[in-house]
């Protein structure tokens, strides 16, 4: 997704052959924490070696005409001198109510909300894309249209690899990127101390 010859809708990089639909096992919900976990079997693999770093939407279409999205971020290996756009996966997980409770509410409301979240389930928001289309996509299109040297990582990358933004000129957080781990926060603070600019577009 991004800006391609004044087309903000994106460009198709990959298409699979028709895939069989697999009957998956029933998802599990932890009765104590409310964690929803879909331990499903994969029936497809997407080759990423030839993909440019960036954010991709995978569109899944059925023979009946139904469709949904899945997110894919190809992380930039070298962000030196680049403006890094951070994709907020943890906030998507917090608001996701697919198959069970989110961090905000369950069947009864706030009292039986999930205390533990899993990314191993589809996303109920944005036709499967989470909050990306509303809060991140316009930012990506604007940055790429302006010719800014962009790079891409997720918030999980910041939490798990402090060097993922080493040498970046700036880090951009799109709207509503509100769920952080302590490790992510430390990574950003340390980068800021070393001179990396931090920019927040409505993230609280």
Show where each model-derived region lies.
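The substrate-binding groove and active-site-proximal loops of carbohydrate-active enzymes
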Residues: 44-47, 122-132, 169-182
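Aromatic-Pro/Gly-enriched surface loop or interdomain linker
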Residues: 1-25, 30-34, 55, 63-165
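Short alpha-helical segments and helix-capping/turn motifs at coil-helix boundaries
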Residues: 41-45, 57-59, 65-75, 183-187
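Short, hydrophobic beta-strand segments
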Residues: 17-20, 25, 38-52, 60
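Short alpha-beta junction capping motif
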Residues: 83-86, 165-204
């Amino acid at each position: 997704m991004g800006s391609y010859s004044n087309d903000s809708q994106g460009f198709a990089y990959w298409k699979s052959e028709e895939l069989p639909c697999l009957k998956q096992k029933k998802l599990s919900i932890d009765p104590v924490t409310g964690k929803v976990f879909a331990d499903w079997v994969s029936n497809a693999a997407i080759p990423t070696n030839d993909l440019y770093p960036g954010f991709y939407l995978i569109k899944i279409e059925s023979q009946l005409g139904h469709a949904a999205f899945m997110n894919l971020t190809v992380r930039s290996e070298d962000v030196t001198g680049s403006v890094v756009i951070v994709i907020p996966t943890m906030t998507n997980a917090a608001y996701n109510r697919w198959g069970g409770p989110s961090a905000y509410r369950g069947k009864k409301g706030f009292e039986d909300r999930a205390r533990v979240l899993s990314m191993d389930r589809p996303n109920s928001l944005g036709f499967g894309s989470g909050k990306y289309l509303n809060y991140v996509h316009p930012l990506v299109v604007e940055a790429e249209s302006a010719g800014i040297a962009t790079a891409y990582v997720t918030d999980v990358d910041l939490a798990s690899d402090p060097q993922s933004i080493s040498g970046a000129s700036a880090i951009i957080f799109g709207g509503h990127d509100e769920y952080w781990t302590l490790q992510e926060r430390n990574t950003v603070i340390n980068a800021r101390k070393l001179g990396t600019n931090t920019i927040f577009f409505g993230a609280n």
